[in-house]
Amino acid sequence: MSLIKKKNKDIRIIPLGGVGEIAKNMYIVEVDDEMFMLDAGLMFPEDEMLGVDIVIPDIQYVIENKERLKGIFLTHGHEHAIGAVSYVLEQIDAPVYGSKLTIALVKEAMKARNIKKKVRYYTVNHDSIMRFKNVNVSFFNTTHSIPDSLGVCIHTSYGSIVYTGEFKFDQSLHGHYAPDLKRMAEIGDEGVFALISDSTEAEKPGYNTPENIIEHHMYDAFAKVKGRLIVSCYASNFVRIQQVLNIASQLNRKVSFLGRSLESSFNIARKMGYFDIPKDLLIPINEVENYPKNEVIIIATGMQGEPVEALSQMARKKHKIMNIEEGDSIFLAITASANMEVIIADTLNELVRAGAHIIPNNKKIHASSHGCMEELKMMLNIMKPEYFVPVQGEFKMQIAHAKLAAETGVAPEKIFLVEKGDVISYNGKDMILNEKVQSGNILIDGIGVGDVGNIVLRDRHLLAEDGIFIAVVTLDPKNRRIAAGPEIQSRGFVYVRESEELLKEAEEKVRKIVEEGLQEKRIEWSEIKQNMRDQISKLLFESTKRRPMIIPVISEI
């Protein structure tokens, strides 16, 4: 089934996110004068991003070329793929294409942020063909941990540009999770010019354990639990949640959810028929105490670190709703990212101290939602791309995926290891990497978008590490004298009662600096403040080897 529209001239592929990181997916494909955005995801902040809520890609390049943007094409409903859509649509008018569930989740996100902008939504499936001036766009079903996941295929005269989205191959999953192998094979046979593909598990050998085997071993583990069972998993892992529901029904246990992040997405998916839930299986969390402990399963859910934080609070008897009790069993059904490993280890220790039993999370009862090495090679062999762009992973994962591509026959010079903002362009003969566009991170803190940058983060780190030191002086400029102060305030720097001599020395230093400034023919407030910063910083560092943030405050009467 050829969907080539016309003879094309120019092709460009530009990652704005989702490279060098496992999140924030956003890839721009340009064919002649038309631009297509593939996914628009967010990333949860790293530890050093103090006070930041989420991170989205910098879309300045898209804004500057917004009249060419033909649409935002979404592969699935996870935050890594759709989390930035509402922020993009605040700045750009563009139609949104996605599966039924994905579109429903985007609409809910728009509603949650109270964005009332009229948006053109197009619900697509594996049979859909979207026709544009220069190209046609089709879709194929993929398998992920959320239903209705899609790959995107942009048909050009050079062959298709295929974006797999996040995927794995698991023939035990059916219905809304089943991959469309037949359509993938057709696309590969028609000719794939460039493949843009998920690298998250490119370092993991073999295949994922099939989900039906996972569920079988989960059943065996859960059946041995005599008391209360708490399962911790991400709200976005619909496959795992369905498995727990299935097992609970078989074990005659009621299920209750603990975690706000699940409520909206779960309820949307439930109403749309994506969950199979036996009657009377679910109970409200406030009714759990009405049942014997061996008749309930609590699913503690959330995004990123929320499930682990909830367990930690329960172990420390600090949770508002429920605490860990002697004899509870815990199953942690989440993948530990690098920055979560220490937190998870500490939490497991807290749980054991509180009297809980930990169900080991081994390969028998855990599978990734991303394809391992053999699954990635399977996709490469099906698509047989001329050019290959590994994405959706840390740089070492992209390199591992590049090696797999070379093993399956892709020429090494036609494999591109890219960073954010890199432009891969077709010059009529070869794809080359010779340009860069503006890219980076936009940090979102509360309702502020982009108003937290590196300088603000640096200040937050400084405050967190060495505290703050404030010197307040009130001046009488007319009579050139100090009217009140200096008064010293510090927070997070030193314990005042044990540092009185140092603070008195700082007061005298401030007094001397100000008095010298008042003797000048022209009083330069900015110069006085800078002298206060420099000299007080030197004094404090010599005494404490710390550099607090110094804020001089000068007022006049």
Swiss-Prot record:
Cofactor binding remark: Binds up to 2 Zn(2+) ions per subunit. It is not clear if Zn(2+) or Mg(2+) is physiologically important.
Main localization (coarse): cytoplasm
A GO cellular component entry from the record: cytoplasm
Biological process (GO), any one: rRNA processing
CDD domains: RNaseJ_MBL-fold (cd07714)
Keywords: Cytoplasm, Endonuclease, Exonuclease, Hydrolase, Metal-binding, Nuclease, RNA-binding, rRNA processing, Zinc
The UniProt record lists the keyword Nuclease: yes
E.C. numbers: 3.1.-.-
Zinc listed as a keyword: yes
Enzyme class: hydrolase
Gene3D superfamilies: 3.10.20.580, Metallo-hydrolase/oxidoreductase, Ribonuclease Z/Hydroxyacylglutathione hydrolase-like
Binding site for Zn(2+): 76, 78, 144, 166
A Pfam family it matches: RMMBL
Compartments (UniProt record): Cytoplasm
Swiss-Prot/TrEMBL cofactor(s): Zn(2+)
InterPro entries found in the cross-reference section: Metallo-B-lactamas, RibonucZ/Hydroxyglut_hydro, RMMBL, RNase_J, RNase_J_2, RNase_J_b_CASP, RNase_J_bac, RNase_J_C
GO molecular function list: 5'-3' RNA exonuclease activity; RNA binding; RNA endonuclease activity; zinc ion binding
Residues where substrate binds: 366-370
Domain of life, per lineage: Bacteria
Assembly and binders: Homodimer, may be a subunit of the RNA degradosome.
Family annotation (PANTHER family): RIBONUCLEASE J, RIBONUCLEASE J 2
Role played: An RNase that has 5'-3' exonuclease and possibly endoonuclease activity. Involved in maturation of rRNA and in some organisms also mRNA maturation and/or decay.
Family: Belongs to the metallo-beta-lactamase superfamily. RNA-metabolizing metallo-beta-lactamase-like family. Bacterial RNase J subfamily.
Protein known as: Ribonuclease J 2
Organism of provenance: Staphylococcus epidermidis (strain ATCC 12228 / FDA PCI 1200)
Lineage of origin: Bacteria, Bacillati, Bacillota, Bacilli, Bacillales
